[in-house]
Amino acid sequence: MNLMNATPTEYVWKYNPVSGIPAGAQQNYGATIDWVLPGGTGFAIATNDIRRQTLNPAVTRAITARFEAESDQQPYASPHETNVIAANVLDSGYPKSGLYPLELSGNQRVQLAGGLMVGRTEGRMQLAGGLTEGRVQLSGGFHGRPLVRGRSRRPPRWCGAELTGNGLPEQAEVTSDTYKYFLRTQGPSQVVEEPGVFSQRQFMTTFLPSVVPHPFDSTNPGDFPAQYSAIYKGRTAFEDTFWDW
């Protein structure tokens, strides 16, 4: 079809929601596109280029049908995928990749809670105490070999770096951001305790906005409004000419 001779229609430009490509003005997704050409030859060349890159409507329908047949388009697993997950993960016990052989030195790789599990233990970081200690332990357990707990040379102890808090947060920590914003904008200036700081209300009552009625009526170029006149060039009077640029 010669686009320069195409008959303009009442349709407008829009994106094709099926393919995501700017499909132009069209009657439906299965018909040939009728283009509106307000831009002449240059617009027609760009339009032809887009048409060459746009899939045939039949191809787009085939792709869409295949996608709908192979996917339920839901944000969760299909029945087949659910069965695969259950057979390979949920029904197979503990994931083997998350376990490591027990280190008799007492240094686990990652242990979230103390104790042994089938001769294996989790990780080098221990978050809760057991019979052994990790390299980084966040809560206490027994120090020494697991099987000689009563004969250990050292008593049970807490970790060297303990994560604690005093339970009494600072007032600034528990103050909501909304109230902090209120204090900054409309609260009294005493809250800031800095000289020269005004609240929003105090600033508006101290520095009243000036109103200049008919600002460009003055012929004096030294007046303040004259500096913002479109026909003022910084000379002794106004000129009815505009800037060259």
UniProtKB/Swiss-Prot annotation:
Q: Which UniProt keywords apply?
A: Capsid protein, Host nucleus, Late protein, Phosphoprotein, Virion
Protein induction? Expressed in the late phase of the viral replicative cycle.
- Gene Ontology terms for molecular function: hexon binding
Q: Which residues form the propeptide?
A: 116-167
Description of post-translational modifications: Cleaved by the viral protease during virion maturation. May cause the middle segment to be shed from the capsid.
Pfam families, A to Z: Adeno_PVIII
Q: Where is this site: Cleavage?
A: G115, L116, G167, L168
A GO CC annotation recorded here is: host cell nucleus
Quaternary structure note: Interacts with the peripentonal hexons as well as the hexons in the facets. Part of a complex composed of the core-capsid bridging protein, the endosome lysis protein VI and the hexon-linking protein VIII; these interactions bridge the virus core to the capsid.
Name the protein family: Belongs to the adenoviridae hexon-linking protein family.
HAMAP family in the record, alphabetically?
Answer: ADV_CAP8
**Further facts:** All late proteins expressed from the major late promoter are produced by alternative splicing and alternative polyadenylation of the same gene giving rise to non-overlapping ORFs. A leader sequence is present in the N-terminus of all these mRNAs and is recognized by the viral shutoff protein to provide expression although conventional translation via ribosome scanning from the cap has been shut off in the host cell.
Q: What is this protein called?
A: Pre-hexon-linking protein VIII
